[in-house]
Amino acid sequence: MKYNNKIPLVKNVGFGTNFHYQNKLGLDKAYASDNATYIDNDTLYIAGTRNMRDIFDDITKLPFGLTKHADRYRQAEQVLKENPNVKKLVGHSLSSSVSDELRKAHPDRNLEIKAMYGSPFVQLSGQKHENRFRHKFDPISFLDRGSKTVDLGLVSPLEAHGYDQYSLLFNIEET
């Protein structure tokens, strides 16, 4: 399968299964919900930036390690407290930071990061994280060298920062 006339480089990123498609469906529902979250069985999906308040938090809190003070963190933590069955987290953009912070804040829950897309982390070297994914030209996650980078031929920054393109290729053969 080709995407924008290029064969994507998708080594070891969960293709060949419906992993990314399930995450897309959950994140779509989180973005559509009032509280920016959606639960499916034991997985909490958390929407990323979607309004001016989130943009404010992106600029004034995330770069300074103050994710716990972000509005999205408070929303997700409330849902987490009300749902003790949640064991896995999926996030996109802002909510990647929120997911990671929730995991750290609740060690007793043994929360697992199922997937994070377009994470705004700064990691210039070191080990790749199994469940962090980014597109090659994503401007938000360009300093996250700890994620698995996929080249889908997306050059538009808005498209490259999305999470839904992974699901289009969920049954592609790895190269």
Which stretches of residues belong to each language-model region?
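Gly/Ala-rich beta-loop-alpha elbow adjacent to hydrolase catalytic centers
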Residues: 90-95, 99
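Alpha/beta hydrolase fold serine-hydrolase catalytic domain that processes acyl esters and thioesters
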Residues: 1-88, 107-175
